[in-house]
Amino acid sequence: MSGVGCILGIETSCDETAVAVLNQRSVLSHEVLSQKEHSSFGGVVPEIAARAHSDFLHVLVSKAMGGAHIGFSDLSAIAVTSGPGLVGSLIVGVMLAKAIAYVAHKPIIAVNHLEAHALVARMIYADLEFPFLVLIISGGHCQFLIAHDVGRYTKLGESVDDSLGESFDKVARMLGLGYPGGPEVESCALKGDAHRFPFPRALKSRPGCNFSFSGLKTAVRYTIAKEGKLDNQALYDICASFQQCVGEILVSRIANAMAAAKSADSSISKMVVSGGVAANNFLRGSIRKCANELGFDAIFPPQELCTDNGIMVGWAGLENLRKGNFSSLELIPRARWPLCP
């Protein structure tokens, strides 16, 4: 097949090793390797993550290229997550992408991991035009943005302490659940009473678009200590109450962000919600209901595209390719890379 317009996307920002080949019409192949080694530690161990990327990334690239039935010479560019993320993990992806680009004489595109989350919905929803509101809720980030165009964003608010994904992971660890914590807490919450424990809703009634989750996390810790040895029902109720609290915090902040977005540009009527936490079904329902009541369309990528993946990196690469945004082989991965200067 012709490889004109094909792009290779490489994602190694944290603990998922992911590679995809796609063009503007379809995903030709996608390979993901999740690192189970971290579960016993209750979180990601940077050294283990980097070593696993180094061991398996080249294998996934070969499988993805074979699955797409093309060679490196057929690619239009190589897109690679270059930040933000764990620098040791990022280096593995960037170095292999540089090697492929150099040997195949192809341009390289440095992809911002947050922009990849923000833009992937445009691959699924062809009618999603700029500008739109974005809520990124992931393991390392929690922020509202207005997406004006590829590479052009305005930040409306962010977490002033912990990210939402980190909070889910830490609550799961306190309760002796597995990693990643989000799916574990969500599963337990289905069997719990969401109103048993009145956890604090930080900033809920205040103006602005910032978040705070550290107080909620502390309240969960105190509740666990107060309850002593937890039976299954108490554990389920803590998970349900925590998740309910998170939903209410998000809804209150979303209302403020939508008002701020409308004030900035009255044409904005859609909000993309992405990042790993956006895969949570309860939160998706709460956010969708809130958005509908406020006259917005809440747009969620499929759940498999909310968590880290190579498809979103490849798509962000295509968006930048159309803009002529290329990087040099001297690009350096960045642990911190805000979308808004």
UniProtKB/Swiss-Prot annotation:
Specify where it is mainly localized.
Answer: cytoplasm
Q: Does the keyword Acyltransferase apply?
A: yes
Q: Which cofactor does it need?
A: Fe(2+)
Cofactor binding, per record: Binds 1 Fe(2+) ion per subunit.
Q: Cite the binding residues for substrate.
A: 136-140, 169, 182, 280
Q: Which keywords label this protein?
A: Acyltransferase, Cytoplasm, Iron, Metal-binding, Transferase, tRNA processing
| Any one of the GO BP annotations | tRNA threonylcarbamoyladenosine modification
Q: Does the keyword Cytoplasm apply?
A: yes
Where is Fe cation annotated to bind? 113, 117, 308
* Gene Ontology annotations for the cellular component aspect, listed alphabetically: cytoplasm
Record InterPro entries: ATPase_NBD, Gcp-like_dom, KAE1/TsaD, TsaD
Catalytic reaction list: L-threonylcarbamoyladenylate + adenosine(37) in tRNA = N(6)-L-threonylcarbamoyladenosine(37) in tRNA + AMP + H(+)
What is the top-level taxon of the source organism? Bacteria
Q: Where in the cell is it found?
A: Cytoplasm
Q: Name one GO molecular function term.
A: N(6)-L-threonylcarbamoyladenine synthase activity
Enzyme Commission code(s) on record: 2.3.1.234
What does this protein do, in the record's words? Required for the formation of a threonylcarbamoyl group on adenosine at position 37 (t(6)A37) in tRNAs that read codons beginning with adenine. Is involved in the transfer of the threonylcarbamoyl moiety of threonylcarbamoyl-AMP (TC-AMP) to the N6 group of A37, together with TsaE and TsaB. TsaD likely plays a direct catalytic role in this reaction.
Protein family according to the UniProt entry: Belongs to the KAE1 / TsaD family.
Q: Which NCBIfam families match?
A: gcp_kae1, T6A_TsaD_YgjD
| Protein name, entry field | tRNA N6-adenosine threonylcarbamoyltransferase
Q: Which organism does this record belong to?
A: Anaplasma marginale (strain St. Maries)
Upper taxonomic lineage: Bacteria, Pseudomonadati, Pseudomonadota, Alphaproteobacteria, Rickettsiales
